[in-house]
Amino acid sequence: MVDHSNTRVVVGMSGGVDSSVTALLLKQQGYDVIGVFMKNWDDTDENGVCTATEDYEDVAKVASKIGIPYYSVNFEKEYWDRVFEYFLDEYKHGRTPNPDVMCNKEVKFKAFLDYAMELDADFIAMGHYAQIERDENGIAHMLRGGDSNKDQTYFLSALSQDQLQKSMFPIGHMQKSEVRRLAEEAGLATAKKKDSTGICFIGERNFKQFLGEYLPAQPGKMMTVDGLEKGTHDGLMYYTIGQRSGLGIGGGGESNDPWFVVGKDLEQNILYVGQGYHNELLYADQLDASKMTWITPVDHGTDFHCTAKFRYRQQDVGITVHMTSETTATVVFDAPVRAITPGQAVVFYDGAECLGGGTIDVAYKVATDDADKQVLQYV
């Protein structure tokens, strides 16, 4: 048996079952384990309850149970500067950002990693459902989690090789049910705690009300691309491509099909809507992406075929990547895809391996007759 006692691992403990079992497994494997709770947001909820206090109490219970030291570190400034300001700026520009991708890149695997190094850590560990495999050259490859329903590689796609080299995902190969079983068998206080949902560190508060506290809403016209007015919207930032709820439009026209958001015009403050789930305006053939990063230093070439996800839990789609610079690309789909959303992450896969990703700037159709782009989303 390998002696890990001289290898220090600092575990990011959230007060949830996944990070609790992560710390438990590492302790059982003989590592020198330290638990650290990150406070990244002043998260007093709508009822005046500070959930961070409750979560830290759970961390304390778990750490005491398994016999490891634990600390709390405050990254509220780092989160605000590196994640939240980006989040607001994207919404201000009519896009729908994915703060979880940025939070992992800038806070959990950057600010936290830096802090762990100050504690003389050899590695950090997180309770993510993803796997790391190193090849014969020592290059770290990120693979999908063993539980396909919990796989989190989509949110980890912006991590660098350096970040991955210093990271461990001890539960990455496991099923969620197995994680809960281990927690129960060990008598951990978090064994039956429900999973957190909502935006990274903002939680489950009323999103529209929350966003309105930071950005002034600008109501405007809601209309079809043919110019037919359908009412007013509350502010473009509250809507995303493909959204059905909250439009306040009944059936009408030649059918009673529901209405969906099909585009935004930021300059004129117009929200475009279309009728029918399969409305052709919701489908795109390709997209342009920026901020492209790759996890491994492998040269994929300027044109290559793989699969991609455009949102979490989506089925993989066959695509061809055409690199237009080191950090930008045009992504062409094997078949049209519905409701591509600017601001979200496009994440690339080769089988089980997550290759990296980028940010969706715009999606469009290319007309077959003159190859003109029909830009659908106007942002």
Swiss-Prot record:
Assign the protein's first listed, main location to one coarse class.
cytoplasm
Enzyme Commission (EC) number: 2.8.1.13
| SUPFAM superfamilies in UniProt | Adenine nucleotide alpha hydrolases-like
Q: What does this protein do?
A: Catalyzes the 2-thiolation of uridine at the wobble position (U34) of tRNA, leading to the formation of s(2)U34.
Which Cys-Cys disulfides exist here?
Answer: 103-200
Similarity comment text for this entry: Belongs to the MnmA/TRMU family.
Locate the residues binding ATP: 12-19, 38, 127
Q: Which gene encodes it?
A: mnmA
Span list, region Interaction with target base in tRNA = 98-100
Protein name, as recorded: tRNA-specific 2-thiouridylase MnmA
Q: Does the keyword Cytoplasm apply?
A: yes
The record's active-site residues are 103 (nucleophile), 200 (cysteine persulfide intermediate)
Listed GO biological process terms = tRNA wobble position uridine thiolation
Q: Which source organism?
A: Latilactobacillus sakei subsp. sakei (strain 23K) (Lactobacillus sakei subsp. sakei)
Site positions (Interaction with tRNA) are 128, 344
Q: Which UniProt keywords apply?
A: ATP-binding, Cytoplasm, Disulfide bond, Nucleotide-binding, RNA-binding, Transferase, tRNA processing, tRNA-binding
HAMAP family per UniProt: tRNA_thiouridyl_MnmA
